[in-house]
C-alpha cells in the first residue's frame, strides 16, 4: 500500500530525545572511563574487608543512588529485595508535582525511558514530559487522509497510549479520536494511521498482542485488530517527501468484532478498557453496560464468553496479572477480580470507600494492585493477603514496627484548576478540589511512579501530574 502524504510537520528527533541525555552512559564513554592509568608506582593493596550487606530497602536504594550496583553483597541482595520492595515502596514514595500549564486532564501515560513520560490529555494533546527538568515537547497528531473525515474533537481527548512489547512502537489516538495512530520509538516519527473502515466513534482503549499487532476498543461498541507491516518502519518506505513533510501509511483493520448487546442496557455497550493475556493469548474487554468479554486473539478475534460484572456502574479500567492469571476491573466503588477459567471467583471484590468517586486507574505488579481513585488518592492492595497495605506505627522508613491498622493512602497535590465562570457558578469557587487520578504508570527499575489526572466533573478544566519517587 503506498503511503499517503499528510500535513503533519516533522519534529527533530533530538527534541524528544534531548531529555534522556543522562539516562544512560554511552558505551564509548563508559569504556574511556575505565581505561585511566594511575600515576606513580603500583602498591600491593590489602584485601578489602567485605562489608556487611544491610538488609534494608532504604540502604539498598541509597547505595544504588551512589552507584553501588557492583558493591559486594548488593548484587545478590537485589533479587531478594524485589518482592519485599514491592510491599515497602508505596510508603517510601514522596511527591513532586509537575507543571503542565493550561492543559486539560491527563488521561493516559507511559514511560519512554528513565526520564521521559508520554501523555495524552482531554484537550487532544500528545506530549512528552521530562520528569527531571519539567520540559514539555508536544507531538503533532496524525490526520485522516480524506478531507471529509472527522477532524479534531477537543472535548474527547486521547484516552489510551500503549507501547509494544519491544518498546519500538507506540499506539495512541489520532487528530480524529476514532483513528489509531502508530509512532516509531524513540524518535516518535509517524508510522501509520488506522483511519480506513475502522471505528465510527472515539477510541477508549488499546492493547498490543505482539510487536506488530494491536487491538483497539471504541465507544461504538467494536473491537478492531490492526497489523503494522514492518515495511512501514524498517526504512523500505521513504519517510518524507521533497518538502520535508512526513509520510505515513493509512491502514484498515484486519478484523472487527462487535460486542453483544445486553438486554438490560443495550444502548451503552461502549468498550471502555482492554487487557491482553500473553500467556493465554486472550483479550479481555470491559463495556459500560456492565459486562466483561473475553476473546481468543490470534490472526482474528473469536469471542469466548461474556460475564455480567458484580458491580456494573462506571466500569472504566481493566488490568491483567500474568502471574496470577487474574483480571481486575475498576468500577464506581469496587475492584472486582475475575479468573475466566473459574466458575466460582475465590477473591472477593475490594471496596475503595472513596466517597463514590470511583476507581479511575488500575495496575498490577506481582501480587500488589495499585488503585487510583476519583478523589485524588492512591491505594495499594495485596492480593495474596486480600487486604490493603497499612501504615506503619513509626514514621521511620527503616522501622520494622507493627502496622497501625490504617489503610496506606498517598494523597496527590492540588495540581492546577482553571477558575472560570463554571467553577464559580456551579461549584461555589471551592478552593480544594481533589483530582481524579485517570492514569498512573510505574518505572520499576528506577522505583518511580508517574501519576496524571485532573478534576472529576466533566465541565471543569484543570490538570494534575506528579512524580512519586
Swiss-Prot record:
Keywords: Repeat, WD repeat. InterPro entries: Beta-prop_DCAF12 (IPR056151), DCAF12 (IPR051191), WD40/YVTN_repeat-like_dom_sf (IPR015943), WD40_repeat_dom_sf (IPR036322), WD40_rpt (IPR001680). Residues 1-34 are annotated as: Disordered. Pfam families: Beta-prop_DCAF12. It comes from the Eukaryota. WD repeats lie at residues 153-193, 198-236, 266-305, 354-391. Transmembrane segments: none annotated. Belongs to the WD repeat DCAF12 family. This is DDB1- and CUL4-associated factor 12-like protein 2. The lineage of its organism: Eukaryota, Metazoa, Chordata, Craniata, Vertebrata.
Amino acid at each position: 500500500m503506498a503511503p499517503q502524504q499528510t500535513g503533519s510537520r516533522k519534529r527533530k528527533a533530538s527534541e524528544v530525545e534531548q531529555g534522556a541525555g543522562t539516562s544512560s552512559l554511552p558505551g564509548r564513554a563508559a569504556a574511556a572511563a575505565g581505561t585511566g592509568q594511575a600515576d606513580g608506582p603500583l602498591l600491593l593493596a590489602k584485601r578489602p574487608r567485605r562489608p556487611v550487606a544491610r538488609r534494608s530497602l532504604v540502604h539498598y536504594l541509597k547505595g544504588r543512588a551512589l552507584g553501588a550496583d557492583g558493591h559486594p553483597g548488593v548484587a545478590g541482595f537485589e533479587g531478594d529485595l524485589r518482592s519485599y520492595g514491592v510491599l515497602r515502596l508505596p510508603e517510601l514514595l514522596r511527591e513532586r508535582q509537575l507543571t503542565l500549564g493550561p492543559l486539560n486532564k491527563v488521561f493516559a501515560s507511559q514511560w519512554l525511558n528513565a526520564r521521559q513520560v508520554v501523555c495524552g490529555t482531554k484537550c487532544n494533546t500528545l506530549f512528552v514530559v521530562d520528569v527531571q527538568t519539567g520540559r514539555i515537547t508536544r507531538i503533532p497528531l496524525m490526520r485522516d487522509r480524506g478531507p471529509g473525515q472527522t477532524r479534531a474533537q477537543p472535548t474527547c481527548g486521547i484516552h489510551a497510549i500503549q507501547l509494544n512489547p519491544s518498546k519500538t512502537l507506540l499506539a495512541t489516538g489520532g487528530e480524529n479520536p476514532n483513528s489509531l495512530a502508530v509512532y516509531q520509538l524513540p524518535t516518535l516519527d509517524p508510522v501509520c494511521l488506522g483511519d480506513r473502515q475502522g471505528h465510527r466513534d472515539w477510541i477508549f482503549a488499546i492493547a498490543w498482542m505482539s510487536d506488530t499487532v494491536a487491538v483497539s476498543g471504541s465507544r461504538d461498541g467494536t473491537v478492531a485488530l490492526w497489523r503494522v507491516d514492518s515495511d512501514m518502519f524498517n526504512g523500505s518506505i521513504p519517510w518524507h517527501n521533497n518538502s520535508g513533510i512526513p509520510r505515513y501509511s493509512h491502514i484498515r483493520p484486519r478484523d472487527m468484532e462487535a460486542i453483544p448487546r445486553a438486554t438490560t442496557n443495550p444502548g451503552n455497550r461502549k468498550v471502555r478498557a482492554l487487557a491482553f493475556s500473553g500467556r493465554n493469548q486472550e483479550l479481555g474487554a470491559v463495556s459500560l453496560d456492565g459486562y466483561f468479554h473475553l476473546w481468543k486473539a490470534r490472526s482474528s478475534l473469536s469471542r469466548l464468553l461474556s460475564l455480567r460484572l458484580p458491580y456494573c456502574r462506571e466500569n472504566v479500567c481493566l488490568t491483567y496479572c500474568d502471574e496470577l492469571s487474574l483480571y481486575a476491573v475498576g468500577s464506581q466503588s469496587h475492584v472486582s477480580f475475575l479468573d475466566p477459567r473459574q466458575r466460582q471467583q475465590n477473591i472477593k471484590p475490594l471496596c475503595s470507600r472513596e466517597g463514590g468517586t470511583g476507581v479511575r486507574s488500575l495496575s498490577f505488579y506481582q501480587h500488589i494492585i495499585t488503585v487510583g481513585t476519583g478523589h485524588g488518592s492512591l491505594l495499594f492492595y495485596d492480593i495474596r493477603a486480600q487486604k490493603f497495605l497499612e501504615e506503619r506505627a513509626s514514621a521511620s522508613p527503616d522501622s520494622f514496627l507493627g502496622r497501625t491498622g490504617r489503610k496506606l493512602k498517598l494523597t496527590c497535590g492540588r495540581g492546577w484548576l482553571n477558575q472560570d465562570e463554571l467553577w464559580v457558578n456551579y461549584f461555589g469557587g471551592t478552593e480544594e478540589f481533589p483530582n481524579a487520578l485517570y492514569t498512573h504508570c510505574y518505572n520499576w527499575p528506577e522505583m518511580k511512579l508517574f501519576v496524571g489526572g485532573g478534576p472529576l466533573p466533566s465541565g471543569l478544566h484543570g490538570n494534575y501530574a506528579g512524580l512519586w519517587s
